[in-house]
Amino acid sequence: MKYAHAPFVGGHRVSARASILVVLALLAFAFVPTTRAVPPPDADPFYAASVDLGTHPAGAVLRTRSIALYGLPLPVSAWQVQYRTNDANGLPIAGMTTVLAPNWPWFGPGQRPLLSYQIAEDSLGSRCAPSYALRGGWDLGGANTYIDTPFIAEALRRGWAVVTSDYEGPESRFLDGVNAGRAVLDGIRAARALAPDGVGPASPVGGWGYSGGAFATLWAAQMQSEYAPDVQFAGVTAGGIPADWPAMVHGVDGGTQAGLAMLALTAIAKNEPNSGVLELLNERGRSNFAEDVNACGPDFVVKYINAHVDDFAAVPDVLSHPDFRAATDRQELGGGAPVTPMYLYHSTTDNVIPVAGFTDLLGRYCAQGADITSVHSTLPGHNPTAVGEAAGAMGFLADRFAGVPVAPGCHGR
């Protein structure tokens, strides 16, 4: 890829092409299988919730362990942290997060920044959890974690500490915005309580996620002022943003990414048994639901290549059925605007998430007074944009961590 002009980041010219090459080079380290036996979360007592879970405040650290980090070729310390959070119904659940900190001093201003990075978990089973993959649990279900590892590595290389939570929770609730947002915010609280080297109460906090990770990031940002006023973001970046779920699932239905439509349908039926969505499936659909109820996103993609969702439904055009639409409406972003500066980006030719939903979300956020730098990227497609626009996202965060002021209001780039 060629760029006529390199962007300015923090007052310095940065080559976007060079940043892409660095990310791709780091990516090579993330795909070497480990020989260590790592038990999956369901077989690991460390993940089990304690009986006194409800006596702890949200964000409280329940237990920690140092781990050997998998796939990051940098001198860093890493911990798995179990913490108390709340599900969408306000009930206490045991969250799990991975906290990473560089093994060298922070030389920037103030305390070491803390980046909350949300991996696109996109799954229905605990073996798909980022914490399992980052510890070396080699499973196809962790593919998104392995793909996102280079972005985490670049944050660490810059000297930032990173917290990345299993924001779907112990029940692996994909497509549950409130559940995800609370888990992210409480994961940040837990990371600050752990206080890895250089991280303290005054550490600036940032949020970043792409695709499914953007969904969790923005739900957390929307909920922050009400749910966690003590967690104030210096800035948030998000790209490939899931907005307009019906358009998304219709767009991939029948194609190579049809499994994502089946993932969304299965998640709604699993998360909301009273929604009526399960009753919309035919016998074949119910049989597959039973098979897939704990599957990972990559499992769905492989299994349902070129499938049509209506082949598994008892009603025509199930993705437009009022029961399904009502359930997905509850998961749409934009009900409230984050109070932190944001850098939001999306490919105009995104082949997974149509750009129209992104443009509409920008309009809703801006109408509510948000401060946004937006990018309608000309990079082709969903995955290339994740890499190609990473330099701009990280530059925005670096400026916010350095205290560089941002122009108020909404601005396109």
Where are these regions (language model features)?
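Short beta-strand element of the alpha/beta-hydrolase
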Residues: G110-D122, A129-Y132
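Catalytic-loop region of hydrolases
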Residues: R36-W106
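Histidine-bearing beta->alpha loop at or near hydrolase active sites
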Residues: I372-A386
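Primarily recognizes the serine-hydrolase "nucleophile elbow" in alpha/beta-hydrolase
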Residues: R189-G259
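Accessory cap/linker subdomain of secreted extracellular hydrolases
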Residues: V51, I241-G335
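Short beta-strand/loop motif that positions the catalytic acidic residue
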Residues: L344-D350
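Alpha/beta-hydrolase active-site loop
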Residues: I147-P150, F174-P196
